[in-house]
């Protein structure tokens, strides 16, 4: 036993000098192991070693044999401590660059891990983490994700709910620009601390040039490049370097500001030397743009003043680029004010014309007819003007007889001539209207009468001393019968006169019938007058109906100017005395009711528009022809009405009832 002890100690004593020769390898291995073991484990190992040193050799051998040979349980617990190393950084960077939060997307766990594993294999410088450690890192970066099991029966998979793959993968980060390796002997003895700043500046300048060429943007420092990458999300904003850059950004800006100011001053000095004077090119480049925006609203005087200012300021520009830009711009002209715009000479004059409508009957469609009226010289005519007219009167003149209503044309004899104008005294002029006179008058041939049977007509306006503008359009509403060239009211009036003569002849044979409201004449006269008035008329028919109305009024009223009127009145009185007082009262009442029915008829106003044209001779000829036709029709109607009114007076006095 005594011999075995020294033999057992001999390897230790012999091993020490051998260990001294090979002391480099164990020390390096121990240092590496200590770096991978935590302080708590190291303290436990040191405590165990102190206890083991008290054991005997057999005890130590027994302890050695009892140590576990397979992978120990402590290796799994030691891996989380390794996450702060290079493998953790690679996994963290890959997750931030390839994944992003999205609440409506799910990714299978296995597909995410397979992509990470391929990335590590492509680098060939780090081994991939286990699936458990990889899942822990994902939960640290995206704490809101949830694990879900999705898929059909037999094909279900566990997924990360709340993340998705990025559609735009960010660029890999730029390599570090710190020159820590410059202290190594590989850089050579030429590298010294003095030129180190120059190397850093040169490297930063090259990097900025490269970034400008790639990103199509100018950068003044490497810090701006890094900030641009962070702002555009080209690199991860949650990395440690990003936090350091954000924290130290203000301090670096303060340090960089003086250098940028000096660079700006040097640039300004160079530009001023190139221009040959003080810094003035920037000021005249802006006023032309401002004046372009304001030139549209300025007055011509102010625009000319600003134009002179531009002309004076442009030569002051020293840069040829500014001069070329100003030369290419068009000449600015002031906008013309609204007051200088010449108005259109033509004006629209609208006059109303009283046209009778059918009492209680349906309204007929009234077309609109355009008439071209050339300027016509003044047409004089002497006629009374006591009735209302449409428009002003043109020219004074003595009247030979009073008239109770508006008339169309001018009268030269005792009686009412139509006139365009309202006045209680005698007037001289031609107008557009309708009226009746108590004295037999003669209508001049120059009275303006509207021709019928045409939609576009040329008619002259009577006696207007003022100059007329050409191209004035007026429209008149004319019934359909007139527009189509028909003249049904003439036939109706003839038929009515024939009916009255036949009815009067029949009454002579037998005893007249009595009606509760009055005699037959009393009821027939208003209907006749209403039918004549309500029927749509042409201008020629207006003359005929006006003549008949004048005769009716003449018969109904006891007094009337003119010798012809008195003679007719005497004949009527003599015959009335023979017939009896009853028939005389009936005739007077019928004439009065006819007049009242005519007065109660409401006139319908219509719009009239006239277009003055160039033709004057044709208008005068049309006016003359229509006036002659109107006078002839008036005379014919006058005779018919007298016959129809005098026929009932030749009744047999014996046939009248007691």
UniProtKB/Swiss-Prot annotation:
Q: Where is the composition biased (Gly residues)?
A: 382-398, 406-422
The biased composition feature labelled Basic residues covers 506-516
The residue ranges flagged as biased composition, category Basic and acidic residues, are 1-10, 277-309, 465-476, 489-498, 648-658
Cellular component GO terms, alphabetical? nucleoplasm; RNA polymerase II transcription regulator complex
Q: Name a biological process GO annotation.
A: negative regulation of transcription by RNA polymerase II
Q: Where is this region: Disordered?
A: 1-28, 250-315, 382-422, 443-602, 624-658
DNA-binding positions are 91-167
Enumerate the UniProt keywords alphabetically.
Acetylation, Activator, DNA-binding, Nucleus, Phosphoprotein, Transcription, Transcription regulation
Instruction: Kindly list the places in or outside the cell where this protein is found, as annotated in its UniProt entry.
Output: Nucleus
Cite the residue spans of the region called N-terminal domain: 24-89
Q: Which PROSITE patterns match?
A: RFX_DBD
InterPro entries the record matches: DNA-bd_RFX, RFX-like, RFX5_C, WH-like_DNA-bd_sf, WH_DNA-bd_sf
GO MF entry, a single one: DNA-binding transcription activator activity, RNA polymerase II-specific
| Keyword Nucleus belongs to the record | yes
**Location of region: Leucine-rich region:** 61-65
Q: Where is this motif: PxLPxI/L motif?
A: 172-177
Spell out the post-translational modification annotation for this entry: Phosphorylated.
Q: How does it assemble?
A: Homodimer. The RFX heterotetrameric complex consists of 2 molecules of RFX5 and one each of RFXAP and RFX-B/RFXANK; with each subunit representing a separate complementation group. Interacts (via PxLPxI/L motif) with RFXANK (via ankyrin repeats); the interaction is direct. RFX forms cooperative DNA binding complexes with X2BP and CBF/NF-Y. RFX associates with CIITA to form an active transcriptional complex.
Q: What is known of its domains?
A: The N-terminus is required for dimer formation, association with RFXANK and RFXAP, assembly of the RFX complex, and for binding of this complex to its X box target site in the MHC-II promoter. The C-terminus mediates cooperative binding between the RFX complex and NF-Y.
Q: Which PANTHER family match?
A: DNA-BINDING PROTEIN RFX5, RFX TRANSCRIPTION FACTOR FAMILY
Write down what this protein is called: DNA-binding protein Rfx5
Its taxonomic placement starts with: Eukaryota, Metazoa, Chordata, Craniata, Vertebrata
